[in-house]
Amino acid sequence: VSDGSTRALSRHLKRFSTSVDNLESDYLLEFFENVIATTPDTGDWFPRIEFREQLPIGEQLFFRLRHAPVRTQTCILWSLDELDPRQNPTVKGPDLSACQKLRRKANLHGADEAVILDGDGFIADGALSAIVWWRDGVLCAPDESTPWLPSITRELVFELASQAGHDTRTERAKPEELANCETWSLSSLQGIRGVTSWQNIPMGKHKMLNSFRKRLMMLSEG
C-alpha cells in the first residue's frame, strides 16, 4: 500500500479467501473491511493478514500493519543447495517461516533471493517471489510440473504481456538454461525486479524491464 493505493487488492483477498474456505463469508468480509479501514491513506505499508487454524472460531484472523521495506529495481539470485523444504507450496502462509529462512541463507551468499529447484534441478519458485524470464521474445515461467505459489504479480505481468502483443508460455527450465535471458523476480512488495546476477550464469540485458515496471505501477488503485 503506497499512499492509499494498492494493486489487485481484490485478487489478493480472493486468494486468501480460497485458502480459508471453512470460514463464514460474512465474518471474512467484515474482517477485510476492517483491514482496509485501518490501513493509513498515507505512507508506504506492507500489511499482512493471517489465519491461525489452531485458535477458536471467531478468533482466527489477525491483521499486522507493517512499514514497507525498501524497494529496489534489481536483485541477485542464488539457487538453493538443498531439497525444497516447503510442505504446502501452493498455499501462501504455511511455509512463510521456511521461505524466510531460505532468503536469509541467500543473503549469506551475497544474494537477495533464493530460487527453489525441484529434485531434478528445474526452477520451481523463488523463496518469496515468482521467477519469470524472456526467451526469444516470449515471456516464460515455470510450468505445472514444479510446485509454485499462485502469484498475483505473475498473473498481472502475464496479462500485461498478452495485452502488449507478446506471447507467453510455461516451461521446465534449469537455471543454467536461462543464460543470456532477461530474467525477473516478481512480488507484490517489489513489483518487477530485474535479475543482474545469478551465480555464474550470464544474465540478459533488461530490455523490457522499465516499460513493464511502468505498466504494472499504472494498475495501482486508490
Where do the PLM segments sit?
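Dinucleotide-binding Rossmann-like beta1-alpha1 core, especially the glycine-rich loop
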Residues: R48
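Helix-start/capping segments and mature chain N-termini
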Residues: V1-T38, D44, R52-G222
